[in-house]
C-alpha cells in the first residue's frame, strides 16, 4: 500500500501554486468508490514545509458553497468587529421555532459552532454588514469573496464559493494565527472548533448545503486539522450529496483515509 508519505511534495502557499503542486493519491479513491460517492479529500502535512496530497486534482481546486464551514470566518469576523463581544457571550433564543430543536436554546459561541446554529450566525452576519464582511473576506483571501445573494445567506445559497485547497490554506493560516485578525480572536475560534480530544486533537467544522438532486447535487463538507504529537495535518473533504442518508459519509470517508495513514484511530 502506498501511504500519504509516498505521495506528498513541497507546496507553495498561494492558492494557484498549491493547487498545481499537490500530488494525486489515487489509492484513496477506493473509499469513495466503496460508497459510490463523488468527492475530494485534500490532506496536508505541516512539518518544516507544507506537503499535500489529494485523490482528485481537478476537484481539489473546484469551488463550492462553503455552507456551515463558513461559520469559522464568520465567527472571527464577528469578534473582530465587536458584534461578538467575547467567547463568553450568550446568544439568546427568541423563543420562536427553529429548524432544529438543538438550536432552540441560549447558546455560547462554542455551543453555536458545535451545533451549527444557522440563525445565530445569520444574525452575526446581519450585524457585521456587507461592507465589513466584504473587507474581511478579502483580507482572508477566502474563496471567491462573492457575498451576493443576501448578507445572511450568501454562504448557504448565494454566490460565495471556496475550494478544498483554499479551505486548507485558510485553516493553516488560522492555526498559525496568521489571518488578518487579532491572535486572541483566532485562538477563541480555534478552541471552539475542538470536536475530539483523545490522543490527538481535532479542530473541525462540517457543512451541508442541502441534498439537491442527482443531476444537481448539494455539497457536504468536513474541514479542519489534526494535532498529533509534533505534527499537524490539515484536511478538507467535500462530496456531492443527493440523499441525506449519505450525510455521515462526509466524516466517515476522510476518517478512514486518515486512519489508513496512521494519523487518527488505531
UniProtKB/Swiss-Prot annotation:
InterPro entries: Bact_Transpept/Beta-Lactamase, Beta-lactam/transpept-like, Beta-lactam_class-D_AS, PCN-bd_Tpept. One of its GO terms (molecular function) is beta-lactamase activity. The modification N6-carboxylysine is found at residue 71. Substrate binds at residue 205. Residues 1-20 form the signal peptide. Pfam families: Transpeptidase. Keywords: Antibiotic resistance, Hydrolase, Plasmid, Signal. It catalyses: a beta-lactam + H2O = a substituted beta-amino acid. It comes from the Bacteria. One of its GO terms (biological process) is antibiotic catabolic process. The active site is at 68 (acyl-ester intermediate). GO terms for cellular component: plasma membrane. Its EC number is 3.5.2.6. The keyword Membrane does not apply. This is an oxacillin-hydrolyzing beta-lactamase. Belongs to the class-D beta-lactamase family. This is Beta-lactamase OXA-7. The gene is bla.
